[in-house]
Regions:
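Glycine-rich flavin
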Residues: 5-109
Length: 109
């Protein structure tokens, strides 16, 4: 991974993302039985901190995928929802979060 190259290109290199998927980095807190690594909050935070210290864009990508992306399903989804969605977001499908605020602005972009 080359953070300067990622910044210049405005995106993270595909080979970096592919390597992170192979390592399980997109499912850090998902339970092992659903395809994740099953890390605790402390382990998750420390790992994203270390990654972000090297390349903030990669750290933010991992964090967004696992926080606003699928954290709601992880914390509040029923067993059927967890079994349906969590294996997918640990095996190569990016999680998404949609936001609309027609009368205000969070500047989420």
């Amino acid at each position: 991974n080359d953070p300067a190259q990622n910044d210049a290109a405005g995106q993270i290199a595909e080979r970096t993302l592919a390597g992170l998927w192979r390592l399980g980095a997109f499912g850090l807190q998902v339970p092992c039985e659903l395809g994740g690594l099953g890390l605790s909050n402390t382990q998750y935070a420390r790992l994203v901190e270390v990654v972000g210290a090297h390349d903030l864009g990669v750290g933010i990508t991992l964090g967004a995928h696992q926080s606003i992306g699928f954290k709601g399903v992880l914390l509040y989804g029923d067993e059927r929802q967890r079994a349906r969605y969590l294996p997918r977001v640990t095996a190569g499908e990016y999680a998404a979060f949609c936001l609309t605020e027609p009368a205000s602005g969070s500047d989420a972009g």
